[in-house]
Curated annotation (Swiss-Prot):
Belongs to the heat shock protein 70 family. InterPro entries: ATPase_NBD (IPR043129), Chaperone_DnaK (IPR012725), Heat_shock_70_CS (IPR018181), HSP70_C_sf (IPR029048), HSP70_peptide-bd_sf (IPR029047), Hsp_70_fam (IPR013126). Transmembrane segments: none annotated. Residues 601-638 are annotated as: Disordered. This is Chaperone protein DnaK. One of its GO terms (molecular function) is heat shock protein binding. The keyword Lyase does not apply. Induction: By stress conditions e.g. heat shock. Acts as a chaperone. It holds the Pfam family HSP70.
């Protein structure tokens, strides 16, 4: 039996691993790197480049360089409108209401672009193993819908791979982390914040059994969004300075994207970074430069809402698992965006423990996929993986209601049947409209397919008995059947993404030399002081907003005056004035706080002050609305 490779098909980067010599091995690509950028470029002469070579030429070829394609996988046109405006390449509406990438008039589906990345990973593994590879385990975000999972499987098929299993990314990470601990009894939380998606999964393992207790997340929250807040800030700064809009220039937009990503990465290890983009755009015929210093504190204030958006899925996952935070033995961080210090602090504060640093966030998912491949080939024995379906599945019934057959966090594989009936006399046909989501009404959930069951024997309303069966396989992919018990007639469909893909083979990709990057050193003391001032400004503004009317006007005025002094000192980079202003803010805040306590005005016992973290969760409605659908023509038999 040949090797089953494990592939982490990521939004920003991809990684491939294989189980060899009784351990999983991460395979370096032809550039010598263990991760490969999920970037595809179309260059002159019909050549395609994948990975680092594609990423390197993106600035000079922005409209034909494709990145973050994972965010379009398995989605319809209406669901990706925000993503379309963020990328410099052209995305258009294609067949079956799906998004397509337009390259010189040729429309590529997201599956085809993803297949080119998978082809690169396949070739990387083949070069390492010295043999052809035809089978793979591919990972997906835990919160991927049925259509997104099916699209991933199709991408594998186009790349010439038989996808033996689709595994949730946090589950794969837990498998890699716990392989040598499989016989210990542990409960772990996997916090996976990648380039485009966020997942939180709660798992329990012991005796070789890995069981997912719950999962939650957001398939449109990740590193791309953190990049975007930096891009938005740079665009606004340039507009303020020069009166021109950088988003109207695809090449400038691509340069902003790369600069924002680089700045974000540098701010995980530095407190400040300089963004220097010479000749970014001509204004009235004069070339203009964009040079800005971004501190970590400023970045965290820009990304505050995104960071806080990670909290609610964590709370929901813990609630669904029926556990308290103290029950968790270990917290595992996965995904490049989990390196952001503010994200790590949020995780530590929420779970009450320091996250484990024992895994590589960029590689652990691919390692887990390789472990699952070895389980399937019996190279690893005594390990059982019990995953769950992330979202509820059901059908539309009378009145546009969603009737659930399989609840979220049900262990898969799973099978469930329920009996329904007709909604009108002598009805000879019913439409089975299959839905996925947690909302009560069908129109509020995602439509993932529909089919008709015809030939029902004429009878009065409510008499026929239609048995609907949902069958979810180990990949989380759904098959639905409907059977008329009276006539025995049956109709079934395997829910698939409406991709309209042809199955032609994708040509192999070429790769070039590794990229080089440089970072300039900064004057540490000065940057630390500016960073501290930035942080105090942000926290002071936050607390003034929270205190609102509780803080009398005569107490608020000196605080606002001191705050303005600090802003002026920060702008002029006068370090002595910064120290004076910060001390003044601290003094006036403490005076106001003490007087509020004395007057009984303090609420909840929390002291206000610029040294405290006053960030609050940003309440967000993250519900995703599906397409409008017709009312069903049958009702549930009670």
């Amino acid at each position: 039996m040949g090797k089953i490779i494990g592939i982490d098909l990521g939004t920003t980067n991809s990684c491939v691993a294989v189980f060899e010599g009784n351990e999983p091995v991460v395979i370096a690509n032809s550039e010598g790197k263990r991760t490969t950028p999920s970037v595809v470029a179309f260059v002159d002469g019909g050549e395609r480049k994948v990975g680092d070579p594609a990423k390197r030429q993106a600035i000079t070829n922005p409209t034909r360089t494709i990145f973050s394609i994972k965010r379009f996988m398995g989605e319809n046109w209406d669901q990706v409108q925000k993503e379309v405006t963020r990328v410099p390449y052209k995305v258009v509406k294609g067949d079956n209401n799906t998004p397509r990438v337009d390259i010189d008039g040729r429309l590529y589906t997201p599956q085809e672009i993803s297949a080119m990345i998978l082809q690169k990973m396949k070739k990387t593994a083949e070069d390492y193993l010295g043999q052809e590879v035809t089978e793979a385990v591919i990972t997906v975000p835990a919160y991927f819908s049925d259509s997104q999972r099916q699209a991933t499987k199709e991408a594998g098929q186009i790349a010439g791979l038989e996808v033996k299993r689709i595994v949730n990314e946090p589950t794969a990470a837990a498998l890699a982390y716990g392989l040598d601990k499989a016989h210990k009894d542990m409960k772990i939380a996997v916090f996976d914040l990648g380039g485009g998606t966020f997942d939180i999964s709660i798992l329990e393992f012991g005796g070789g059994v890995f069981e997912v207790l719950s999962t939650n997340g957001d398939t449109h929250l990740g590193g791309d969004d953190f990049d975007q807040v930096i891009i938005n800030w740079l665009v606004q700064e340039f507009k303020n300075d020069e009166g021109a809009d950088l988003t109207q220039d695809p090449m400038a937009l691509q340069r902003l994207k790369e600069a924002a990503e680089k700045a974000k990465i540098e701010l995980s290890s530095s407190t400040s970074t300089e963004i220097n983009l010479p000749y970014i755009m001509p204004v009235n015929g004069v070339p203009k430069h964009l040079v800005k210093t971004l501190t970590r504190a400023k970045f965290e204030s820009l990304a505050h809402g995104l960071i806080q958006a990670c909290l609610e899925p964590c709370k929901k996952a813990m609630s669904d698992a029926g556990l308290s935070n103290s029950d968790i033995d270990e917290v595992i961080l996965v995904g490049g965006s989990s390196r952001i210090p503010a994200v790590q602090k949020l995780v530590e504060d929420f779970f009450g423990k320091t996250p484990s640093k024992g895994v590589n966030p960029d590689e652990v998912v691919a390692v887990g996929a390789a472990v699952q491949g070895a389980v399937l080939t019996d190279e690893i024995k005594g390990v059982v993986l019990l995953d769950v379906t992330p979202l509820s599945m059901g059908i539309e019934t009378l009145g546009g209601v969603m009737t659930k057959l399989i609840d979220a966090n049900t262990t898969i594989p799973a099978r469930k049947s329920e009996t329904f009936s007709t909604a009108a006399d002598n009805q000879s046909e019913v439409t089975i409209h299959v839905l996925q989501g947690e909302r009560p009404m069908a129109a509020q959930n995602k439509s993932i397919g529909q089919f008709n069951l015809s030939g029902i024997a004429p009878a009065r309303r409510g008499v026929p008995q239609i048995e609907v069966t949902f069958d979810i396989d180990a990949n989380g992919i759904l098959k639905v059947s409907a059977k008329d018990k009276a006539t025995g007639k049956e109709q079934a469909i395997r829910i698939e993404a409406s991709s309209g893909l042809s199955k032609e083979e994708i040509e192999k990709m070429k790769a070039e030399a590794e990229a080089n990057a440089e970072a300039d050193k900064k004057e540490r003391e000065k940057i630390d002081k500016l960073n501290q001032a930035d942080s105090v400004i942000f926290q002071t503004e936050n607390q003034l907003k929270e205190l609102g009317d509780k803080l009398p006007a005569d107490k608020k005025a000196p605080i606002e005056a001191a705050l303005q002094k600090l802003k002026d000192a920060h702008k002029s980079q006068d370090l002595a004035a910064i120290d004076t202003a910060m001390a003044e803010i601290n003094t006036v805040f403490q005076t106001a706080s003490a007087e509020m306590y004395a007057q009984g005005g303090a609420q909840g016992g929390a002291q206000a002050g610029p040294d405290m973290d006053a960030g609050q969760n940003a309440g967000q409605d993250n519900s995703k609305h599906g397409d409008n659908v017709q009312d069903a023509d049958f009702e549930e038999v009670k």
